[in-house]
Amino acid sequence: MSGKCDNCDCADSTQCVKKGNSYDLVIVETENRSMDTVFVDAPAAEHDGKCKCGTGCSCVSCTCGH
C-alpha cells in the first residue's frame, strides 16, 4: 500500500510531513477578561529543495509544490 505526500510517493501516508503553517488557537479566560493566543509553527523543513516525507521516505525528485 502506498500513500502520497503532495507529489512525493511514500510507503505510508502517515509519514508525510505536513507542509505550510499550522495554527493552534488557545483561549485563556480570567476573571473579567479573556486573551486569545495563536501559536504559529514553522513550515515543514525542505532539504536542498527536496521533500522529506518522514524518516522512512526521502523524496529526491519532487518539487514540493514549486
UniProtKB/Swiss-Prot annotation:
Designated gene of the protein: MT2
Origin superkingdom: Eukaryota
The protein's role, per its UniProt record: Metallothioneins have a high content of cysteine residues that bind various heavy metals.
Similarity comment: Belongs to the metallothionein superfamily. Type 15 family.
Protein's name in the database: Metallothionein-like protein type 3
GO molecular-function terms, A-Z: copper ion binding; zinc ion binding
Keywords: Metal-binding, Metal-thiolate cluster
Gene Ontology terms: biological process: cellular detoxification; intracellular copper ion homeostasis
